UniProtKB/Swiss-Prot annotation:
Protein task: Catalyzes the reversible transfer of the terminal phosphate of ATP to form a long-chain polyphosphate (polyP).
Pfam families, A to Z: PP_kinase, PP_kinase_C, PP_kinase_C_1, PP_kinase_N
Stretches with biased composition (Basic and acidic residues): 19-30
Species assigned in the record: Mycobacterium ulcerans (strain Agy99)
Protein name as it appears in the record: Polyphosphate kinase
């Protein structure tokens, strides 16, 4: 399954300076031409059109619409469709908490800086509101009209109070009085009771009650508790479901509470009740002061997060006008921030339904294979001995994280010849074996350094806990460089081998998280190459001390080196292409990433396209680049692959200059300017062949994907009736454990 903590994307914060408005027309994306057009004179940025960027906010909404398309796809296993409905909802929550909140702050402050496509914050907010209302309504309809009936056919029902018979109502009455009623707190609003604070993302009932004596009406709010299952399962299930499976009947918790409102308001007449949900601004910045403890500053800001200003109000579409006006007034919400939903609010709760033990309704179980280089034979093989023989590239989740990267750290912790372990930690699992190994290593007397990024959004509290646990065990914990997030995925092991000190390294695209490593697609390089070991030594010295090294032997490091390094390689690719003659078609750039937004990198790609370099982009989420546009991007194609696993790796290939790079950085402002990121060159021909195979599979014309047109619209590909292959399924079959 896909974890419900952070599935599909990370939301960028900071300057909102990218974009181009969306349009209504949808046209199929063009295929990569067999032969590029003839070369045209090289262009400067001034010669590129002003409308060359797509709007990054609307592009993100298009991405979430692709997630919704998976939920609407009846060829998907049914509970996987329910999962994608939950993913869509969680994604949209975070988008409003961060991106929309940032735009609202800029609008309220009167900041008039335009996005890259020339829109003001207010104009972007207007377009976001329109597009969100459309896709949120479609989201609700997919659940109500497609997934919900299909669940019923499989013996899984989400019912209303009106659907229940008397015996079921009596059963739920007992449950309500014993399990729910004690945790409810009805809050009245009158001169003695001000309007209550409504916490972000909480589900609530807005209730109007009438006094029988004088007919006076009053408002009250009832919070639906979030520590009780959202879907209350009725007991007494049988096995009349599909193929003898158990029947499950669920009642939404808010329906149960609504049925017993007279118990909460005895002696009052219930006039009306409606569900609503508010989203609050969670886009805060920690003011880092060299004289203040970062953890204390962060904890102070986390306490403020729950009190952020409202950025969205979700209501059932049957809410009365009077009730809506009251909520708008009391919650201080702009009418343009209201999303009317035709059905249940907060479908992120569908993770509960996904958790049912119905394997026939889910993806087939996949067990990652152990990489052949690390496969145990008669005796367990030392990872250090393996790396002395040559570099290893691991592709997760197809190759196991636990028997490669995790084992690398665990063996280092247990090896008496290991002198030091240094590692960056951005997001890790709650019961992290990586953190446990670091603690064991420190307790065994090794020098252990952990660079813990406590500012990883929405994981701050967990990272603070781990940082303190590591410190208590004797680990040297550092928090990086003031003003920068440390996002790179690097580990360095220093080992004594006779008279020699040897360094072993891991550089990856994904977090050191054994749980998400089963769900996220990532690549990692394990190596004993001396130049990379020397580079990582310099990098950790920079992160933990006062070193400010800007250049490295075999790495590109942000915020100073990645953008310039990539643009330099694009320009070298152009030079090699022109040297061999444009008709030879030698220039060819392939990029795989989560997001492509940065204007300088995008312009470099446009200029390469104009001289005939072929450029293929595989981007999971946001893409501000306009492919296939006449005059500047005819030789660029862009596609997006979504599926069972979250495509998370960042891989760059420059064919004419024969360079492959992997790393943690997407082409976004936050990654290139406000984070410590690392990209490493992969040189071993055995490993570059593996990366080449990955690109060939992702870019196969028959691969199931969406293709981006110059108008900013994504079109499903291949077209109906053509042969279709699934990139991820193909890789699973290739790597499936026996």
């Amino acid at each position: 399954m896909i974890g419900n903590d952070r599935w599909v994307t990370e939301i960028e914060t900071g300057p909102v300076t990218e974009a181009r408005p969306d349009t209504n027309a949808r046209e199929p994306g063009d295929r990569t031409p067999a032969a590029p057009p003839a070369a045209t004179p090289a262009a400067t940025t001034d010669q590129l059109p002003e409308d060359r960027y797509l709007n990054r906010e609307l592009s993100w909404l298009e991405f979430n619409a692709r997630v919704l398309a998976l939920a609407a796809d009846d060829s998907m296993p049914l509970l996987e469709r329910a999962k994608f409905l939950a993913v869509f909802a969680s994604n949209l929550d975070e988008f409003y908490m961060v991106r929309v909140a940032g735009l609202k702050r800029r609008d309220q402050m009167g900041l008039s800086a335009l996005s890259a496509d020339g829109l003001t914050p207010r104009e972007q907010l207007g377009r976001i509101g329109e597009q969100t209302q459309h896709i949120a309504s479609r989201h609700a309809r997919v659940f109500r009209d497609s997934v919900l009936p299909a669940l019923g056919e499989e013996g899984i029902y989400v019912v209303t109070w009106a659907d229940l018979d008397q015996a079921e109502r009596e059963q739920l009455s007992t449950y309500f009085h014993e399990q729910v009623f004690p945790v409810l707190t009805p809050l009245a609003v009158d001169p003695a009771h001000p309007f209550p604070f409504v916490s972000g993302l909480s589900l609530n009932l807005a209730v109007t009650v009438r006094q029988p004596e004088d007919g006076g009406q009053h408002f009250a709010r009832v919070k639906v508790p979030d520590n009780v299952d959202r879907f209350v399962e009725l007991g007494g299930t049988d096995t009349d479901g599909a193929e003898g499976a158990a029947v499950h009947r669920f009642l939404p918790l808010e329906e149960l509470i609504a049925a017993f409102l007279p118990v909460l308001f005895p002696g009052m007449e219930i006039v009306e009740h409606h569900a609503f949900r508010i989203t609050r601004n969670a886009d805060f910045e920690v003011e880092e002061d060299r004289d203040e403890d970062l953890l204390q500053a962060l904890e102070r800001e986390l306490a403020r997060r729950r009190f952020g200003s409202p950025v969205r109000l979700e209501v059932a579409d049957d809410m009365t006008e009077g009730m809506l006006e009251l909520l708008l007034r009391e919650l201080d919400v702009h009418p343009g921030d209201v999303i009317e939903v035709p059905g249940l609010l907060d479908l992120s709760s569908l993770w509960q339904i996904y958790g049912l033990d119905r394997p026939a309704l889910k993806d087939r179980t996949f067990v990652p294979a152990t990489h052949p280089a690390f496969a145990e034979r008669e005796t367990p093989k030392s990872i250090f001995a393996t790396l002395r023989e040559g570099d290893v590239l691991v592709h997760h989740p197809y190759y196991s994280f636990s028997t490669s990267v995790q084992r690398f750290i665990e063996q280092a912790a247990a090896d008496p010849n290991v002198l030091a372990i240094k590692q960056t930690l951005y997001r890790t699992s709650g019961d992290s074996p990586i953190v446990r190994a670091l603690i064991d290593a420190a307790e065994a007397g090794k020098q252990v350094v952990a660079l813990v990024e406590v500012k990883a959004r929405f994981d701050e509290q967990a990272n603070i806990r781990w940082a303190r646990a590591l410190e208590q065990a004797g680990v040297h914990v550092a928090y990086g460089i003031v003003g920068l997030k440390t996002h790179c995925k690097t580990a360095l092991v220093v080992r004594r081998e006779g008279p020699v000190i040897r360094r072993y390294c891991h550089i990856g695209t994904g977090n050191y998280n054994s749980k998400t490593a089963r769900l996220y697609e990532d690549v990692g390089l394990l190596t004993a190459a001396p130049d990379i070991g020397a580079d990582l030594t310099d990098l950790f010295n920079s992160l933990t001390g006062y070193s400010r090294k800007l250049s490295y032997r075999n790495l590109l490091v942000a915020p100073h080196g990645i953008r310039a390094g990539i643009i330099e390689r694009v320009e070298r690719e152009v030079a090699a292409h022109l040297e061999h003659g444009p008709q030879a078609g030698k220039g060819h750039i392939r990029l795989k990433m989560n997001a492509l937004v940065d204007e300088q990198v995008t312009d470099a790609l446009y200029r390469a396209s104009q001289v005939g370099v072929r450029i293929e982009v595989v981007v999971r989420g946001i893409c501000a680049l306009r492919p296939g546009a006449e005059g500047f991007s005819e030789n660029i194609t862009a596609r997006s692959i979504l599926g069972r696993f979250l495509e998370h790796s960042r891989i760059l290939h420059f064919r004419a200059i024969d360079e492959f790079w992997i790393g943690s950085a997407d082409m976004m402002h936050r990654n290139l300017d406000r984070r410590v990121e690392v990209m490493a060159q992969v040189k071993d021909p055995r490993l570059t062949a593996q990366l080449d195979d990955l690109f060939e599979s992702a870019l196969d014309p028959a691969t199931r994907c969406w293709e981006l047109g110059p108008d900013g619209q994504w079109t499903a590909s291949p077209q109906e009736g053509r042969t279709v292959r699934d990139h991820q399924v193909s890789l699973m079959e290739r790597h499936r454990s026996p």
